[in-house]
């Protein structure tokens, strides 16, 4: 089996519009949760979120291209551009046919859905844009990334709620490790700050009115945000051969299903996934120096 390494990183998020900005904000302990400005909040109980401030899509895409891109797809393309430039790979130069593109998203084109429901039910429009469906589909980011960069290997999207991008990276990792492909562009993207989406989350009564504090006894719930993070992964052998910068090695991946409550996770399921990951990577618990938790605060 091939060893798999990360050779390119790209981030476009509320916490930073590049990988460098994102890292700097993390190290400084900054928060990007603030009052929402991109949608009307009069009908909302929770009026805060992690939105990308001062985002102008025309700085990244032509008007013709924007007609095809939901907000969540826009973010993925911007992050993918940074990751691919960072990796130093030109996929059109040859490796594209041996490269996969696998992107995760739990919600897909919510902005497009919201806008078009408003046109139909509030404004009484009879016709919608002919590309409404391709624009909102969950595989839109993957498709646009492959077309923009000449990637012709396996490409698909994964939807598994908050685990979507993690599962996407895991599947991409297994494809590279097995030798099915040599490289992969993978990660996740979301743009969930729409009126309809927020009202749906409010109905679950899991939204915090101020901030997300998952490890506090005073936690009040979660806060929705938006953004994308993409990485380029490849065989260690090829990365060394081309003198690529290597950020990290992916040692293993594991996943499980709770098969229990519709919203309440089980400790056994999480423990099983972690054990599966350790086993897959040939590691012991004492080998782990950092754990990144999924802290919903609920």
Write out the residue ranges for each language-model feature:
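Condensing-enzyme catalytic core mediating Claisen C-C bond formation in acyl metabolism
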Residues: 3-7, 30-34, 207-283, 287-290
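Conserved beta-ketoacyl condensing-enzyme motif
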Residues: 6, 21-22, 27-160, 189-197, ...
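Short beta-strand segments
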Residues: 7-10, 102-104, 159, 184-190, ...
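Short acidic, glycine/serine/threonine-rich loops at helix termini
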Residues: 16-17, 112-115, 169, 194-200, ...
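Stable alpha-helical structural segments in soluble proteins, enriched in small hydrophobic residues
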Residues: 75-87, 168, 273-281
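Short loop segments at secondary-structure junctions
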Residues: 88, 179, 234-238
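Short conserved active-site loop signatures built around small residues
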Residues: 165
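Short, high-confidence coil segments that cap the C-terminus of an alpha-helix
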Residues: 181-182, 288
């Amino acid at each position: 089996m091939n060893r798999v390494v990360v050779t390119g990183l790209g981030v476009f998020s509320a916490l930073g519009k590049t990988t460098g900005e994102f890292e700097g904000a993390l190290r400084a302990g900054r928060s990007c949760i603030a009052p929402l400005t991109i949608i009307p909040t009069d009908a909302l109980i929770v009026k805060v979120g992690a939105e990308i401030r001062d985002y102008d899509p025309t700085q990244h895409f032509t008007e013709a291209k924007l007609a095809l891109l939901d907000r969540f797809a826009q973010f993925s393309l911007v992050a993918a551009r940074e990751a691919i430039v960072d990796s130093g790979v030109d996929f059109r130069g040859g490796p594209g046919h041996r490269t996969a593109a696998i992107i995760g998203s739990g919600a897909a084109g919510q902005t497009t859905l919201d806008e078009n429901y408003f046109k139909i039910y509030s404004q009484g429009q009879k016709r919608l844009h002919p590309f409404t469906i391709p624009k909102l589909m969950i595989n839109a980011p993957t498709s646009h990334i492959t077309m923009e960069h000449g990637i012709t290997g396996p490409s698909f999207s994964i939807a598994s709620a908050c685990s979507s991008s993690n599962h996407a990276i895991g599947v991409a990792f297994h494809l590279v490790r097995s030798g099915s492909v040599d490289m992969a562009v993978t990660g996740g993207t979301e743009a969930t700050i729409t009126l309809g989406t927020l009202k749906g989350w409010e109905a679950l009564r899991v939204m915090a009115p101020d901030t997300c504090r998952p490890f506090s006894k005073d936690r009040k719930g979660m806060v929705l945000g938006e953004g994308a993070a993409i990485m380029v992964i490849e065989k260690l052998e090829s990365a060394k051969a081309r003198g690529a910068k290597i950020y990290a090695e992916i040692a293993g991946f594991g996943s499980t299903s709770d098969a229990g409550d519709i919203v309440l996770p089980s400790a056994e399921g999480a423990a099983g996934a972690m054990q599966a990951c350790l086993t897959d990577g040939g590691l012991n618990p004492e080998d782990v120096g950092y754990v990144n938790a999924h802290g919903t605060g609920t």
